[in-house]
Amino acid sequence: MLKRNVSVAVAAALALSLAACGSSPASSAASSEAVSSEAASSEATAAPAAGDFDVDQDITVISREDGSGTRGAFIELTGVEAKNDAGEKVDNTTEAAAIQSSTNGVLTAVSNDETAIGYISLGSLNNDVKAVTVEGVAPSADTVKDGTYTLARPFNIVTNGEAADPVAVDFIAYCMSTDGQALATEEGYIGDVGADYTSTQPAGKIVVGGSSSVSPLMEKLIEAYKTVNPNATLELQTTDSTTGVSGVLDGTYTIGMASRELKDSEVEGGAKATVLAKDGIAVIVSNDNPTDNLTVDQIKGIYTGELTTWADVQ
């Protein structure tokens, strides 16, 4: 009895196999087409889910703090800063903006929030966020250099009058040398040709402080300079541009860092700027945000609070 049941099962399996092999080309094609159609339908259904973004969401505005050179340059270049009836410059950044006190703070805030927008030094841009094009122009060393990307500013070395400290004089000469400017370019900034340089090997300690945007480049320059002149000690303190300038004038810093032009009042107080390099200001959004381009007027509207949702800039 067991042998008979096995024989029946084998025969049934063989019949099914022969039926499948004997399928007509038309039925096979139809079956294949049905499978393909089903796969295409599934893919079409899944595609929007992968890029789903609600444009009606409120924009989370991320800004730098008062005193930041990046903020100062950004609001000037975008028109967020404007003169009032008395002719005084006023920063019209929306009060709803979330304030971050460093470049890394802005990067973290934007990367963790799909509705956020921020601005940072181009040299600090990484893959955690997306830089939008401005007026259709992508931020890069080349577009900053040729002027087609308009959100750009200088990185300044600041001293109290002419530098007098031997280490400061030698270090600044290194920064402006062929090697120093090449390093700036390698780090993603826009350096100059640079001058010939031979270290005088001075000994002593200086303190360099200021802008958090300039700080990453300055750190690289200090590391490189120490290999040229091991006799010197350089301490780097990262704060902001305004503190960088005031620190030089009150003696806290030997050299200041500012990621903006000096104010008239600072120059009148004795501050002297030397352009270390040029840098773009990248406007950044989350990698999950489909927005790829903004106009300067749209950026201004977002930061003054006139445009409040992502639908307003589509």
PLM regions and their residue ranges:
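Exported/periplasmic ABC-transporter solute-binding proteins
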Residues: 22-35, 39-314
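C-terminal motif of bacterial Sec signal peptides marking the signal peptidase cleavage site
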Residues: 16-20
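Bacterial Sec-dependent N-terminal signal peptides
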Residues: 1-9
